[in-house]
């Protein structure tokens, strides 16, 4: 397949490309690219291992340099956006701008999902002595982003100095207990306050946001839940691992960190990609919808901004007779040791996803395939066969229920076993067929 993830180091106009770091840390463009390349490979391998643990094989995405051998492991992208303007923009606006700019550039392609890091992110510094919340820390940070959806996962670089430049430095970086100088540098460590915590939380955030570009929604637990900032526990053993704590929503993790989600639609009969990022913060915050401006290389549906509080899965679905059985639930429930896992629905969706499978020989088949959801009859029809159906809360992307079909011969029809109620929240039906086509309908 030619489908790939493309790591980028985005340098704004008027910026020298050096990321913020202490004076004893190499913050050059080459150093940034080395750190991003190592991080991308870590996520690539971790994706495969965690899918293997779910019993679907070691599947993962390809990186740009594995497809185009002449390309570097991390591409430097010179943006036309002025650095001063970028530092005044909200992360949703940065996501929209860079997404549009990338698609209109020579790199623009529907065969790429971009993993971008903004060089000019800057923590302005503070004299505040009291501990700050994540939102307060972000308010002191310019050109900050941690947002994924559609074809772009975008991040700031305020903690990139805590990342390793080589494979041999990975474990020492996770184990680095040096306190963050939180008056001069961003502390995005899940409230652990260490350089190792910053590396773990920000790498885990990249893992989570990249998952949204692969059409994953939020889950109560696991990688697409709130466990991702303990990613260091996958690589460390014994007493050296960071301890798991619970937040006030009874979730295992460090502390509240930022989440985002995406609403992506693909029309099966025509080529159309629809993407919107949905920013989801800590348990007492709000969610905010952003949107792409129209692109020449893809159809974008615009939606007006919507602000809504975060909701957890509703108990209204607890009585559904066809709810997923115990055998379909997560095989890696949080046990105090490993909160980093794909829930079963995420594993199934990824295992059939176009970015995780060989495209050759399936493209001609896909032309004649039919995938449709009849909202009136609550009936899904797929000529290729249905592999997974998810019911999500449209406001925050939370997966409320899922139905997986992993037998060799998948279902061609599926009647969603509930009806919409005027009092219920707005729901989105997400369907993936045997060829990896994804349909979303609200």
Describe each region flagged by the PLM.
Residues 436-442:
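Edge beta-strands of extracellular beta-sandwich domains
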Residues 200-217:
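Active-site recognition of the HExxH zinc-binding catalytic motif
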Residues 1-152, 157-158, 201, 399-407:
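Propeptide-to-catalytic entry region of secreted or membrane-anchored zinc metalloproteases
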Residues 20-23, 167, 218, 236-239:
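Short coil/turn segments at secondary-structure boundaries
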Residues 48, 52, 215-219, 229:
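Short amphipathic alpha-helices and their capping/turn residues within compact interaction modules
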Residues 14-18, 124-126, 162-164, 221-223, ...:
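Eukaryotic short linear interaction motifs
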Residues 126-196:
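Active-site scaffold of zinc-dependent metalloenzymes
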């Amino acid at each position: 397949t030619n489908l790939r993830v493309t790591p980028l180091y985005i340098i704004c106009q008027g910026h020298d490309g050096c990321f913020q770091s202490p004076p004893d840390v190499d913050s050059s463009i080459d150093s940034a690219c080395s750190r991003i390349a190592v991080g991308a490979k870590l996520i690539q391998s971790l994706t495969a291992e965690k899918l293997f643990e779910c019993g679907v094989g070691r599947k993962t995405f390809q990186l740009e340099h594995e497809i185009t051998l002449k390309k570097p492991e991390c591409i430097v992208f010179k943006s036309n956006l002025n650095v001063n303007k970028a530092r005044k923009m909200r992360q949703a606006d940065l996501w929209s701008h860079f997404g549009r700019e990338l698609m209109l550039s020579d790199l623009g392609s529907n065969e790429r999902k971009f993993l971008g890091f903004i060089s000019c992110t800057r923590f302005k510094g503070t004299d505040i002595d009291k501990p700050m919340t994540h939102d307060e820390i972000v308010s002191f940070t310019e050109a900050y982003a941690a947002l994924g959806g559609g074809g772009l996962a975008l991040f700031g670089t305020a903690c990139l100095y805590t990342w390793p430049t080589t494979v041999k430095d990975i474990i020492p970086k996770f184990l680095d207990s040096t306190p963050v100088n939180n008056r001069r540098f961003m502390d995005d460590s899940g409230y652990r306050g260490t350089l190792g915590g910053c590396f773990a939380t920000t790498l885990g955030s990249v893992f989570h946001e990249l998952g949204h570009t692969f059409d994953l929604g939020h889950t109560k637990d696991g990688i697409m839940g709130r466990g991702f900032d303990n990613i260091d526990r996958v690589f460390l053993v014994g007493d050296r691992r960071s301890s798991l704590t619970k937040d006030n929503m009874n979730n295992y993790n460090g502390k509240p960190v930022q989440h985002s989600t995406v609403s992506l639609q693909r029309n099966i009969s025509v080529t159309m990609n629809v993407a919107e990022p949905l920013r989801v913060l800590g348990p007492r915050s709000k969610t905010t919808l952003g949107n792409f401006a129209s692109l020449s290389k893809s159809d974008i549906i615009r939606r007006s901004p919507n602000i809504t509080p975060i909701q957890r899965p509703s108990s209204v679905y607890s009585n559904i007779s066809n709810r997923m059985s115990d055998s379909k639930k997560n095989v890696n429930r949080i046990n105090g040791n490993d909160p980093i896992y794909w829930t079963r629905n995420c594993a199934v969706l990824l295992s059939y996803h176009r970015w995780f499978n060989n495209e050759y020989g399936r493209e001609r088949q896909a032309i004649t395939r039919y995938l449709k959801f009849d909202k009136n009859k609550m009936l899904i029809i797929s000529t290729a066969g249905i592999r997974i159906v998810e019911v999500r809360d449209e406001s925050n992307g939370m997966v409320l229920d899922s139905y997986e079909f992993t037998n060799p011969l998948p279902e061609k029809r599926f009647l969603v076993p509930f009806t919409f109620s005027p009092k219920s929240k707005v729901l989105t039906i997400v369907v993936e067929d045997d060829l990896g086509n994804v349909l979303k309908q609200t």
